Amino acid sequence: MTRLTRVAHRAPMRLLPMQPPGVAAAGAAACALGSYGGGLLGGDVVDLHVSAECGAVLALTTQASTKIYKAKADGVPTQQRLTAKVAAGALLVVAPDPLVPFAQSAYVGLQRYALEPGASLVAVDWVGSGRVSSGERWAHSSFSTRTELSWAAAGGGSAASPGSGGVAAGGGSAAAVGGDGAAAGSADAATGGGAAEASRPWLVEAVQLVGGPGSELAFDLGETRRDAYATVVLVGSQAAPVVSRFYSAAAALALRRMRSAGGMRGAAAAPPPDTR
């Protein structure tokens, strides 16, 4: 059974411990990430630190899409940073709703994951095209996001001191702290402090989307409307079922597209990759 052992946050971020029936039945812990007002203003900085201890299963979600509001006159972007340490045997799932960048918004995101040997990760980083119902499609000024994965030494310590918020999950009794910066600092002290010992990233994925009126994603997706972009990272044995489902879905979509384009018919899908 996994329990949240430390939770701390301060504006503009909110962390809401949750325990849906399915999560509880799986012996996992869950926490919803949110913000006051349902979105982030230009110049807001969110700095989240997460630690999943040995054998823990932690899910980080949101209750709705996060709006990225129009940048202020100075053009300073909205920033979100996530630093996570996943211990051996632990599974961290980061599955938020998509970001929704408003027209003339500016956003910079950074996700850093340090995994001990035997750790598993399912992480989704995705963005919608904006307020489509209001006629905004990819009308943001700038949008960039970067994901880094690195190996961490076993027992290398907890994630670094939280800025806007921090979450730790492990065994034992649950404890939660929240409120201002002092509370956030005490949460880190209780989990052991110190930065995660990580090597240089072995995987880096970076995306920059330049928006504006009439912009479209420059990907050939056939006749599919391109209203979202996503990066999905799947690592470790506990992520293997998700890998198989993604592979099956991708193969089915590719086959459907080939058939609709008058290409190969009755093509057989290749066997799924080895996820060991």
Question: Can you say where each PLM-predicted feature lies in the sequence?
Answer:
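N-terminal, charged/glycine-rich beta-strand/loop interface patches
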Residues: M1-P98, A103-Y107
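Short acidic-glycine loop/turn motifs at beta-strand connectors
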Residues: A52-G55, A87-A88, E116-G118, W151-A154, ...
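A structural signal for small-residue-enriched, beta-sheet-centric alpha/beta enzyme cores
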Residues: K70, V127-G155, G192-R276
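Intrinsically disordered, low-complexity boundary segments flanking structured domains
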Residues: T2-R3, R14-L16, A189-G193, F219
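Residues in well-ordered beta-strands of folded domains
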Residues: L16, G34, S51, T61, ...
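Internal, conserved structured core segments that host functional sites
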Residues: T78-W138, F143, T147-E148
